[in-house]
């Protein structure tokens, strides 16, 4: 077993694109995370119906964005949609080492082979291999594993790799 445990608090929000841009813009005005959090909650800038949803999403987004440099946050605000998506993907990979390793070991290999279909079996093989060294993965729920894939209308056991949105 390894001493470095994976952070497994994934959300079903994907990249949380719009919310992340809002948080980055708010942060860029004051450059203080505590003030950013208070302002977003007080003004309901994430436009959630329930405050607990705002707090949960905000906590997740702040963890991710704190991994970016000042220049990265500025590019997130002012960059193209493609640059923004890449930065949000980078922020997710920095926050979730398991996701970064998955991208490196599975997605990269599939891309090199021009295999653009992601299957549940691909995820299962990856998770099984990693659980040998990370006992925290032995108790991971099926829902967390499914965040790596989403059913395709053509084949319930296969999905397309995410487009980055």
Predicted features, each with a name:
Residues 119-133:
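DNA-recognition alpha helix
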Residues 148-155:
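Conserved small/polar residues in nucleotide/adenosyl-binding loops
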Residues 1-86:
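Eukaryotic partner-binding/assembly regions in large regulatory complexes
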Residues 112-119, 144:
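Short basic-aromatic helix/loop recognition motifs at nucleic-acid
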Residues 129-145:
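Short, positively charged loop/turn segments that connect secondary-structure elements
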Residues 20, 99-100, 120:
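Short, leucine-enriched amphipathic alpha-helices that occur as contiguous helical runs
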Residues 88, 95-115:
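Positively charged, polyanion-binding regions of nucleic-acid-associated proteins
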Residues 155, 159-164:
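Positively charged, low-complexity/disordered segments
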């Amino acid at each position: 077993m390894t001493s470095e445990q994976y952070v497994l608090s994934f959300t079903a929000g994907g990249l949380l694109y719009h919310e992340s841009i809002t948080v980055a813009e708010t942060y860029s005005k004051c450059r203080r995370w505590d003030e950013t959090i208070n302002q977003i909650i007080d003004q309901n800038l994430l436009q959630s119906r329930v405050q607990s949803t705002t707090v949960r999403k905000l906590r997740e987004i702040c963890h991710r964005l704190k991994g970016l440099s000042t220049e990265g946050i500025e590019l997130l605000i002012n960059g193209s949609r493609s640059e923004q998506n890449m930065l949000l993907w980078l922020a997710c990979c920095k926050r979730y080492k398991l996701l970064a390793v998955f991208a490196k070991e599975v997605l990269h290999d599939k891309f090199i082979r021009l295999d653009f279909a992601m299957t549940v079996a691909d995820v299962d093989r990856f998770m099984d291999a990693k659980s040998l060294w990370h006992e925290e993965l032995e108790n991971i729920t099926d829902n967390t594993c499914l965040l790596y894939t989403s059913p395709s209308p053509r084949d319930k056991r296969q999905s397309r790799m995410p487009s980055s949105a």
